[in-house]
């Protein structure tokens, strides 16, 4: 959101005071004090001091604790919101003796700040606060996600700002439970919608619902649903089964929401929700299997733009040569990335375009692309040494009786900057790049040169993941 200049200054000041008001004991000036229990917390100074005064006057100077969103861009207990033609306000999140957080609405009038409303929230912890114009009236709504104590699900409330003269400055437009959420213009009408994903872990079902709002509330005539895989489950207690949710184009002009979900500790799936012209669709949901099969992989790798071409690719994995009979914990993988554009051919199925195949070293933060010849002939494999931080590439070929690893072709290594600067440690290695305190380098053997590997080839296929 773009704030007016005065509100940008206000935001920076409130962020500073929020740090001062965190619920912990401090040293120095605040040594010996518990900030949660201060009757009169540290004051804002200058022209903005009236904001805190307005809050405390509305609370009749009783003690309170400021509450902070756990996630998202807005992390302050004081959140300035520009409501456009309806004005502007500061939303103060606080808690007193009750179980639930309150939202206090503070406005400026004739140079003075005053509280015009105070409403009880949905729960005791705020997960995130977002704003978007969901009903098309030119003024944003406030979307608050609340943590719940019973499960990994959350609760959502959407408020509209009705102005200073209304009985309540904030009015509730909708509320719903959800497991995953995205604000997105999915149907391409230049109006944001609310996409909620809900998992029923008891019945092993899941549903995505696309909500359109009007000034009167939910547009029930234009609410769209799509089935999702109900077998997703969180990997840690209290976590979401959805590992990542992002919006990107499926093809030119068609937005989609890419949802990476966990299936236990070992498997990951990607679901793609998009507008099919008349409703909401899940590209990969198999109604026969009642789950997502096509994108399931024994890997925690998420969908991403792996080659920086502007499109999201979805990974699939297969064992590198020589690792087929290894235990799962010992396997090294070749990850092949596919781009889908959402079109489905009756004969060939979904239009999947192979983008690249690579081995990913997630520990050291890089991947190396395999040429198609290496992939099709299964002619190269890797041995990894976590102690030396090396990945050694070997030829893999038929010896007359079986396939086996033969000549060392090259070694990729991650050095610390200090070790790299010691010429005795990096002998024979050639520089590839660096990130932070890590330097990446390669040593190419004579067999590797005979195999067609040179420094230009390595640089072309070596990618530092942090650069994506």
Regions found by a protein language model. Give the residues of each.
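Beta-propeller-forming repeat regions
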Residues: 19, 24-380, 386, 391-394, ...
């Amino acid at each position: 959101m773009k704030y007016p200049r005065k509100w940008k200054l206000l935001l920076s000041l409130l962020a500073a005071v929020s740090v001062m008001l965190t619920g912990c004991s401090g040293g120095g000036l605040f040594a010996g004090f518990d900030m949660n229990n201060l009757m009169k917390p540290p004051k804002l100074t200058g022209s903005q001091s009236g904001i805190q005064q307005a809050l405390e006057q509305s609370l009749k100077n009783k003690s309170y604790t400021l509450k902070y969103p756990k996630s998202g861009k807005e992390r302050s207990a004081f959140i300035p919101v520009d409501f456009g033609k309806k004005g502007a306000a500061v939303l103060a999140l606080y808690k007193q003796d009750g179980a639930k957080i309150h939202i206090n609405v503070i406005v400026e009038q004739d140079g003075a700040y005053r509280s015009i409303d105070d409403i009880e929230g949905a729960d005791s912890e705020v997960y995130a606060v977002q704003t978007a114009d969901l009903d098309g009236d030119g003024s944003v709504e406030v979307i608050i996600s609340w943590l719940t104590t019973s499960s990994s699900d959350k609760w959502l409330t959407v408020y509209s700002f009705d102005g200073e003269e209304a009985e309540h400055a904030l009015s509730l437009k909708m509320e719903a439970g959800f497991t995953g959420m995205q604000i997105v213009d999915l149907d391409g009408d230049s109006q944001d919608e609310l996409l909620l994903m809900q998992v029923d872990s008891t019945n092993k079902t899941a549903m995505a619902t696309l909500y359109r709002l009007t000034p009167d509330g939910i547009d029930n005539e234009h609410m769209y649903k799509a089935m999702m895989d109900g077998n997703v489950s969180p990997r840690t207690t209290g976590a979401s089964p959805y590992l990542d949710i992002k919006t990107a184009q499926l093809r030119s002009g068609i937005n989609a929401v890419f949802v990476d979900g966990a299936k236990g500790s070992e498997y990951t799936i990607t679901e793609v929700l998009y507008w099919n012209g008349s409703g909401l669709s899940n590209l990969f949901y198999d109604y026969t299997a009642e789950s997502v099969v096509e994108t399931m992989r024994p890997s925690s790798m998420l969908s991403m733009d792996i080659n920086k071409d502007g499109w999201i690719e979805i990974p699939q994995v297969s064992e590198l040569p020589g690792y087929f009979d290894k235990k799962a914990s010992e396997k090294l993988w070749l990850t092949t990335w596919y781009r889908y554009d959402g079109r489905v051919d009756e004969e060939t199925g979904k239009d999947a375009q192979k983008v690249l195949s690579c081995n990913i070293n997630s520990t050291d933060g890089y991947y190396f692309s395999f040429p198609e010849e290496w992939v099709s002939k299964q002619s190269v494999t890797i041995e990894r040494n976590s102690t030396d931080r090396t990945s050694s590439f070997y030829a893999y070929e038929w010896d007359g009786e079986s396939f086996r690893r033969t000549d060392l072709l090259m070694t990729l290594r991650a050095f610390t900057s200090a070790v790299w600067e010691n010429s005795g440690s990096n002998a024979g290695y050639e520089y590839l790049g660096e990130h932070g305190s890590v330097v990446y380098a390669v040593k190419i053997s004579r067999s590797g040169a005979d195999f067609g590997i040179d420094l230009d080839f390595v640089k072309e296929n070596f990618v530092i993941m942090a650069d994506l």
